[in-house]
Swiss-Prot record:
Chief location: cytoplasm
InterPro entries registered for this protein in UniProt: ARM-like, ARM-type_fold, Hsp70_NEF-Inhibitors, Nucleotide_exch_fac_Fes1
Single GO biological process annotation from the record: regulation of translation
Species of provenance: Schizosaccharomyces pombe (strain 972 / ATCC 24843) (Fission yeast)
Record-annotated membrane-spanning stretches: none
Protein family according to the UniProt entry: Belongs to the FES1 family.
Gene3D superfamilies documented for this protein: Leucine-rich Repeat Variant
Full protein name: Hsp70 nucleotide exchange factor fes1
Pfam families (UniProt xref): Fes1
Length: 287
């Protein structure tokens, strides 16, 4: 701050005299950063360098990751991960011995690819989907595993190429179904909402999820999750909305009569999950 004030005073003095302005080469770069803002590309490089530096304490690495994640919230910065050659380095952090760094790496990846087709493609080109599923399989921390799952679903939403690629990644669908069967209130709900997102897309992704729904009995598993978490309105809401879309596409649970009975109970407890017309349409589709 003192340097910034001194520089401001110098400029003001120069403006009130006939002397030439100060030579730009003499200006302190830190002062210019205060005035104009640091270059995001440089900040991204510095953050990754700090994350990789073994001499940097863990808490400082976490701060560097937070900075990187905030930077890639801006789509241009996210897309600059390619020319800066940061994708391989970022993905490598999914193998860090520190669970915190693995979690922050997954979070940063999710932020970079979310609603960003260019970054989604860049992740694919860096073998990122395969790496993410490998991390999902090996991860033993639920908190970190949830962030890896978040990165996967962020990459695959509105991404036909990514969905089509899943059949080439060993056991990718099986891993998603395994999480669905866990009935974990957070991770399972994320998978269910991901399936819902695919069902509202009018593209090949929708056809693929309908095919997988038959193959893995997905509606049945979603229904069982709703029963397991029947007092949790958000879990029930996401489950029923997803089941409704499956039903509209003629993919249903094995026992529709049981689902009909459950709908009556859910409607009495959470009437605002659907509109009156939607409740009626769901009932009629099951009858």
């Amino acid at each position: 701050m003192e340097k910034l004030l001194a520089f401001s005073t110098q400029l003001q003095a120069q403006g009130n005299s006939s002397n030439s302005p100060p030579d730009p080469k003499d200006l302190d770069p830190s002062v210019l950063d205060h005035i104009f803002g640091a270059n995001p590309a440089d900040e991204m490089r510095k953050a990754m360098d700090a994350i990789e530096d073994p001499s940097v304490p863990l808490d400082q690495k976490e701060i560097a990751f937070d900075n990187l994640e905030m930077l890639v919230e801006h789509i241009d910065n996210a897309n600059n991960l390619v020319p800066l050659q940061l994708w391989p380095r970022l993905l490598k952090q999914l193998e860090s011995p520190e669970s915190t760094l693995r979690r922050l790496a997954a979070w940063t990846i999710a932020t970079a690819v979310q609603n960003n087709p260019k970054s989604q493609q860049a992740l694919i080109e860096n073998d990122g989907l395969k790496i993410l599923f490998g991390a999902l399989k090996k991860e033993d921390s639920d908190e970190t595993k949830n962030k890896v799952l978040y990165a996967i679903t962020s990459e695959l939403k509105l991404n036909e190429a990514g969905i089509a690629l899943l059949d080439k990644i060993p056991n990718s669908w099986e891993m998603l179904i395994e999480i669905l069967e866990l009935k974990h209130s957070v991770m399972t709900k994320r998978v269910i909402f991901f399936f819902y997102a695919l069902l509202i897309q009018e593209d090949k992704s929708k056809q693929i999820i309908l095919q997988k729904a038959h193959e893995f009995q997905i509606p049945e598993k979603v229904y069982q999750f709703s029963l397991e978490h029947s007092v949790d309105e958000d879990c029930v809401t996401k489950s029923l909305h997803t089941l409704y879309l499956f039903q509209k596409n003629k993919v249903s649970v094995a026992n529709t009569n049981e689902l009909l009975k459950s709908l009556v109970q859910f409607k009495s407890e959470f009437p605002e999950i659907f509109t009156v017309d939607e409740w009626k349409a769901f009932h009629e589709a099951l009858e």
